[in-house]
């Protein structure tokens, strides 16, 4: 929430888009410069935290490397359910309005690395 309050995400892009799975953003500018912030403890079951939120359509979750406590600003939004992520990634919220926008982003043209061919830029993120 601190990053939202600081408008950290304004101007960043969704850099990984996989239809039928998820859209990922929060770490790069349009010209692929990485925007850094501190990492946090991964709040999910296999890391010792009881988090029962399932990775269903519209759920927000923290992106990370294979290192469990490497999550920072990158997040992903589930386009479709992915139960194999349950207990392994820190789900923390759910889109309640605007799932049509998630569908639109999930279906933009991408290159061979699942990166949109035209940048999908985040204008701002606000608390509900």
Predicted regions mapped to residue ranges:
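Cyclophilin-like peptidyl-prolyl cis-trans isomerases
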Residues: 1-128
């Amino acid at each position: 929430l601190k990053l939202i309050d600081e408008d950290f995400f304004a101007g960043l892009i969704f850099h990984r888009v996989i239809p039928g799975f998820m859209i990922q953003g929060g770490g790069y500018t349009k010209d692929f410069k990485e925007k850094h912030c501190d990492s946090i403890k991964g709040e999910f079951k296999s890391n010792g935290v009881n988090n029962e939120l399932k990775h269903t359509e519209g759920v927000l979750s923290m992106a990370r490397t294979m290192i469990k406590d490497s999550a920072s600003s990158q997040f992903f939004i589930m386009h479709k359910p992915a139960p194999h992520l349950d207990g392994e990634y820190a789900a923390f919220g759910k889109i309640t309005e605007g799932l049509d926008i998630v569908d639109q982003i999930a279906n933009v043209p991408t290159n061979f690395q699942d990166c949109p061919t035209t940048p999908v830029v985040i204008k701002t993120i606000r608390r509900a």
